Regions:
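Hydrophobic hinge/microswitch elements
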Residues: 128-132, 137, 141, 195-250, ...
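Short helix-boundary/capping micro-motifs
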Residues: 11-26
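Flexible hinge/capping segments at coil-to-helix
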Residues: 86, 155-163, 167-189
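Central regulatory/effector-binding core of bacterial HTH transcription factors
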Residues: 91-151, 217
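Alpha-helical linker/hinge and terminal dimerization helices associated
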Residues: 42-43, 63-85
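Beta-alpha-beta core module
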Residues: 152-162, 176, 221-271
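Secondary-structure junction motif
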Residues: 187-207, 272-280, 287-295
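A short LG(V/I)-centered, amphipathic sequence patch enriched
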Residues: 40-58
Length: 308
């Protein structure tokens, strides 16, 4: 077993195919097949169920998590060595969710990070917040955006924004200065399954209320479209709304006010690579000048200096 074989195994699982993995890695399909067969022979188990779209076996899924952890540790070792030379090269994998993270938070951080460390190759994967959490747990990404509270990972607080009620133009509630959760239960409700979805669910549960869920959407744009058509009301994070104004919906403050806190998370601060540490440091400089970390992480991060 070697790291190349583990990298190929990880790529096949991510791409769900031998051909796609070969294209991604720039090797032949036969090379991919030989690597998987060599691992299966060494372990004495089948890692994949063969077919048009190969699927992991149960033991394959367990071994994949360990393989990804080993690959992450190997990359961390490379970056520790690179840091001693001024972090001139390396890889950083970032997990991002929704418009708030992908469109508002990530771009200014990436701009400063790339200016400081142009040799670090950055890969960004976007998905629902639940998927980002799974990527972190499986070590598929080095750092990811999450909402707080989050007890699963070590977190670094970045920002908070208001949750607002989203109403169709002409809805009876638009005449009110603020809207309660109980008010929203009288209309069909569009529930988002990304970003602030879990927070909204907890708000209703804590209030002992059950919204009349009309639809559930993975994409915020679908939720906004449902409101704009007049099909439903909803609750969204204010920072996730498009910057351009529209007359198709109206936002109203919630009463009592509710906020969403966004943070960066890592599986384990003890295994953070230098590239990850610097990404978090720059993000906190951009959005949290005080440098306050999240609930689990209090320490200051050591600076990695770029050598010339």
């Amino acid at each position: 077993m070697n790291l190349t074989q583990l990298e190929i195994f990880s790529a096949v699982a991510a791409c769900r195919g031998f051909t796609a993995a070969a294209l991604q890695l720039g090797i032949s399909q036969s090379g991919v097949s030989h690597a998987i067969e060599a691992l299966e022979q060494e372990f004495g188990v089948s890692l994949l169920r063969r077919g048009k779209n190969p699927e992991l076996t149960d033991v394959g899924a367990r071994l994949l998590r360990q393989a990804q952890a080993m690959l992450g540790l190997a990359e961390s070792m490379r970056q520790e060595a690179s840091a001693a030379r001024g972090m001139k090269r390396g890889t950083l994998r970032v997990g991002s969710f929704g418009p708030t993270a992908s469109l508002r938070l990530l771009p200014p951080v990436l701009e400063k990070y790339r200016a400081a460390f142009p040799g670090i190759e950055i890969h960004v994967d976007e998905g629902p917040d639940s998927e980002v959490a799974q990527w972190l747990a499986d070590y598929r990404v080095d750092v990811g955006f999450v909402t707080l509270p989050n007890e699963q990972f070590d977190t670094f607080f970045l920002m908070q924004d208001q949750l607002v009620a989203l109403l169709p133009t002409g809805h009876p509630l638009t005449g009110k200065r603020s809207v309660t959760l109980a008010d929203l239960c009288d209309s069909p409700f569009a529930m988002t399954r990304a970003g602030s979805g879990d927070i909204i669910g907890r708000l209703f549960h804590a209030a002992g209320l059950q919204p009349n869920i009309h639809c559930r959407s993975l994409q915020l744009v679908s939720t906004i479209a449902a409101v704009a058509r007049g099909d439903a009301v909803s609750i969204v994070a204010e920072s996730a709304l498009p910057p351009e104004s529209t007359h198709a919906y109206i936002k109203k403050p919630l009463r009592p006010a509710a906020v969403r806190k966004v943070a960066l998370a890592v599986p384990d601060t003890g295994r953070m690579s230098p590239a990850t540490r610097e990404f978090i440091r720059i993000a906190q400089q951009v959005f949290a000048p005080s440098g306050t970390a999240g609930a689990k992480v209090k320490e200051k991060l050591p600076t990695v200096r770029q050598q010339v």
